């Protein structure tokens, strides 16, 4: 495809950043755009796998401590999320629960699946972590031990999940992940850092990510191709 057509389809404003990053080379700009799409697909797939595994691990832990219907029970009268501090979670759960009940489709599993990444992240924030019994660090059996210099506590996990969620949302909103911050400079440093965070959390969860993502994970290869497009 000619660059003029490519630019018309995706907009001058969007493509100008790619062309600047490639030193004005329009052919390389189109290649960079395509590589960014492929990298976004890869990262989103890995985050999706991570989200499902995290969700299931959290559920298994809370079923064992709070009961088989812990999520629904949290928004029943006098439920643990019936507090002003957890109003957003209460609303999310209640909305999904009511919709499923109206459709005659309610199951605990379907209610779990209706919660977004942000919900699972916030279970590690101080209030939700305490209200669910302060047990959720147990989903990371291989977590590093805290030291006086570094506390690998629920706040640490929350912050790591927040960064992963931010990356997920960037991709979902079609924002590029192949640049340095907001500049028109090719860089895969940030996306590789977030990728390593996910790999580390998989390790802490006792998940063999290499076997899990066999045939799916080509992140480093794509990052290398992207970096080769940097102007000399």
Regions found by a protein language model. Name each.
Residues 1-232:
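Amphipathic alpha-helical interface elements
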């Amino acid at each position: 495809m000619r660059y003029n057509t490519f630019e018309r389809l995706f907009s001058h404003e969007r493509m100008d950043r790619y062309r600047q990053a490639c030193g004005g080379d329009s052919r390389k700009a189109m290649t960079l755009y395509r590589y960014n799409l492929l990298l976004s697909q890869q990262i989103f797939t890995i985050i999706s796998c991570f989200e499902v595994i995290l969700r299931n691990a959290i559920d298994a832990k809370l079923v064992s401590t709070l009961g088989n219907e812990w999520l629904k029970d949290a928004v029943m009268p006098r439920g643990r999320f019936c507090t002003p501090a957890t109003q957003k979670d209460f609303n999310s759960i209640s909305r999904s629960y009511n919709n499923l009940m109206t459709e005659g489709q309610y199951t605990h599993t379907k209610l779990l699946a209706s919660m977004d990444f942000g919900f699972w992240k916030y279970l590690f924030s101080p209030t939700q972590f305490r209200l669910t019994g302060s047990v959720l660090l147990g989903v990371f059996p291989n977590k590093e031990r805290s030291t006086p210099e570094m506390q690998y506590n629920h706040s640490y996990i929350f912050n790591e999940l927040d960064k992963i969620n931010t990356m997920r949302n960037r991709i979902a909103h079609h924002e590029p992940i192949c640049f340095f911050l907001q500049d028109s400079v090719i860089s895969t440093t940030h996306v590789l850092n977030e990728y390593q965070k996910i790999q580390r959390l998989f390790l802490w969860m006792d998940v063999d990510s290499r076997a899990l993502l066999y045939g799916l994970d080509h992140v480093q290869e794509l990052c290398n191709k992207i970096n080769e497009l940097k102007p000399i």
